[in-house]
């Protein structure tokens, strides 16, 4: 059932780290989980042109630490750090609590090897009414130049304005979804076209993570 489950959630703690990292008592857990969701929604909406690949959230007492992996850090930081201050103020207004918010911006070096950024590129091209096969071919070519071992792209919906919705996919190389040690990057994006919504899924196989020998515990 490896193809049925979310590829990232399937590998948490093995080849993927948790996107949110904190502990809470059962009464606080739903509130904090909803806060995380609101934070991600706010950042993705207000920094849609910054090429956000991943958002990591950590909580320590009354402090929230955000790590933004982005293709365009200059857009996030802004001139003289003004963009960070605007983002921090917006998040404080959203949460409505006096919490310290620390934002760390990390630049993504290999843009064409990130599933989220490839998905974003495809949705932008689809919304400009470019033929989907040409977009997929271009995205795969760009990704292969970065030395990945495999990529799969699937687009679903009313492709090229067809009356009946369908799914089309293309794959190059290996994408072993059932291998737990395989480092799989996955993203799902939606393109809003004049014919309706198109769903875009991207899987990238970056190689296998071979675990080292376990350290022996001295008695």
Curated annotation (Swiss-Prot):
Annotated GO CC locations: cyanelle; cytosolic small ribosomal subunit
Domain of life: Eukaryota
Record GO terms (molecular function): rRNA binding; structural constituent of ribosome
Residue stretches making up the KH type-2 domain: 39-109
A Pfam family assignment: Ribosomal_S3_C
Subunit and partners: Part of the 30S ribosomal subunit.
Similarity remark: Belongs to the universal ribosomal protein uS3 family.
Identification of the protein by name: Small ribosomal subunit protein uS3c
